[in-house]
Amino acid sequence: LNHRFNFEGLDVLMTHIGGYPGKYNKRVRMIFEADPPKLFICGHSHICKVMFDKEYNFLHMNPGAIGHHGFHKVRTMLRFSVGEGLIKDLEVVELGIRGNNVKTNMN
């Protein structure tokens, strides 16, 4: 399933399985060819990665995995702010080794 929305002037498309620049699946590639977003967020690979897609002119984000199950070694997420259609203060938050309960202060 896709979720497309506008937040603070930023056109965002989120989906679970989407791929990476140059290797998108057909479903999302068709969306990009018709009307690309400014921010594309997808997951599935459990690999935390942020990159700019020059072909479709948007920022691609995969927050990694925050859960305790999977092949990832470190639990990750992305934190950022949005204002006036721009992404600001992007950071990777590491929540510890997969399988360990780690208390964090997420203020």
Name each model feature, range by range.
Residues 10-12, 39:
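Structural motif
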Residues 8-10, 70, 100, 107:
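Active-site-proximal loop/helix segment associated with metal-binding centers of metalloenzymes
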Residues 1-9:
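Core catalytic region of metal-dependent phosphoesterases/phosphodiesterases
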Residues 83-107:
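Charged phosphate-binding loop/patch that engages nucleotide di/tri-phosphates or the phosphate backbone
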